[in-house]
Amino acid sequence: MKLRANRVGEQMKKELGDIISRKIKDPRVGFVTVTDVQVSGDLQIATVYISVLGDEEQKENTLKGLAKAKGFIRSEIGQRIRLRKTPEISFEFDESIGYGHRIDTLLHEINKEGKREE
């Protein structure tokens, strides 16, 4: 069953990217990238991880805009993907991109310090 949940998650990720970029007209929703979709084993709940370009205020506004459009997004997913029941969708920020950027910055600093000591 886990394989099916992964396949549904990948298909939802592809469709959500298209829906958010082309169908959502809310001005609060800025430049959004869907980084991952985790679907529960029973295909009832989908957690959508997003990355938003901008400051904290823009991120919060984007999350509010997506929450407002959740019903529309779910109905679009239901039309595009044939499932018995469309999963309940929740949006969360993907912190891994910022975390990865921080690690990259620290590694560059360590590399610079190592070259100075030589």
UniProtKB/Swiss-Prot annotation:
Instruction: Please give the Gene Ontology molecular function terms for this protein.
Output: ribosomal small subunit binding
Q: Which InterPro entries match?
A: KH_dom-like_a/b, RbfA, RbfA_dom_sf, Ribosome-bd_factorA_CS
Q: Which Pfam families match?
A: RBFA
Q: Does the keyword Cytoplasm apply?
A: yes
Recite the UniProt keywords alphabetically. Cytoplasm, Ribosome biogenesis
List all disulphide bridges recorded for this chain.
none
What are the GO cellular component annotations? cytosol
Localisation per UniProt entry: Cytoplasm
Mainly resides where? Answer: cytoplasm
Q: Does the keyword Cytoplasm apply?
A: yes
Its Gene Ontology biological processes?
maturation of SSU-rRNA
Q: What does this protein do?
A: One of several proteins that assist in the late maturation steps of the functional core of the 30S ribosomal subunit. Associates with free 30S ribosomal subunits (but not with 30S subunits that are part of 70S ribosomes or polysomes). Required for efficient processing of 16S rRNA. May interact with the 5'-terminal helix region of 16S rRNA.
Its family remark reads: Belongs to the RbfA family.
Q: Subunit info?
A: Monomer. Binds 30S ribosomal subunits, but not 50S ribosomal subunits or 70S ribosomes.
This chain's protein is named: Ribosome-binding factor A
